[in-house]
Amino acid sequence: MAELTLKTAKNTYKLLENSIYDIEKNTDINMSILNAVDALPYNKQTKVLKNILETSTTLCFINLDILSAYRQYLSAQTNYEERYAMKSLNTIMSEGYKKVFGFTQNSKSFWKIHMKSVVNDYPELLADYERITNSLEILALNCVFNKDMRDFSVHYDIDPRKVYSMLSQLSAEEVSDRFTSFFACITDVFVFIRKTIDIVVTPFLSTKI
């Protein structure tokens, strides 16, 4: 872990621990609210609420996974532990981005499907939505997700040479840079979702629950 000083690594390790605790609490709150909404009669409005809350909870899981994997990287004691954490980070970023924004399957993108439908009904959210959409598109261009690494990490390969080569060529600096860019963007999405909850979900629930 030559890219990080020991002091910086320790400070970051502790900060990530605090962030994980906070996100765990948000996840529990989201699930409590989602369960309450599930108990309401199904209609267009409750469907919108579920979409927002499900999106928010999925983001919590992505954040928890990526922060835990980076924390694992910071605490690694062996070369392979570092490499295992790095390939886990890459897989989480690839799968997280696919779930948030999609690569080619837009029907599976909650940003383009769930959140776009909300923005259509709440124009005050449009400017932030378009700004973040642009950031997500740039992220895919500038923060290249390594598909081969993802595939080898999840499925291995019939040829162990390919897996060994992938592990040997892993760059901690490159993966850390990707993590920084990805986390900044996904945090922006998370803040937008929290704003959406304040505007859409909270006022509705205050009259129903």
Residues covered by each model-derived region:
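Amphipathic alpha-helical interface segments
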Residues: 1-142, 168-209
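Histidine-centered, metal-coordinating catalytic motifs and their short helical/loop contexts
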Residues: 136-165
